[in-house]
Amino acid sequence: MSTIKGEQFRVYPPEEGVAIIRAIAEHRWPMTINEAFALRDQFGWRPAPDDGTIFTTPVSNGEEDGYIGNDVTDTSLVSRINFNLTTRLYSDAEPQIDHIIRSQYKAYVDALNSLYGQSSMESSAVGVLNVWNLRSRVSIVLGGTRRFIDVVIESPAMMDLTEAEQRLR
């Protein structure tokens, strides 16, 4: 853990973060909202008082940094789970923290590549995305910027929607 301007910067160690990613990605899908809530609680994530689909992780500085998305066709099912793997900064990281973000991002990519094969990668001025499409049709999207690292695990139904949209283009 590092401190920047009085704020603590936290990172899930890659072993722990990858274990959480695997638990979600390798879960039986479709996943019910109650199964997602059980995983949320198992990971020690704190739900918002008024909405259990929004939560706070241990790497947060107290703000909500995770979300469980409902499937649009059946709200008892989950479409995605999104959470931060680091504290979210409000300005670009100082060099020492930028180095931590970059090295941790690389460690996550290496660990997930060793589990799921080579990812596809997109980069922009804002940051980088690595995407793994699993045989189960679950997708893992790891994002890194100069301010944070996050991950989205999307259901097979989301991949079906993405493919349908691509066919329409």
Give the predicted meaning of each segment.
Residues 1-126, 137-138, 144-169:
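Short helix/turn-capping signatures at newly exposed starts of structured segments
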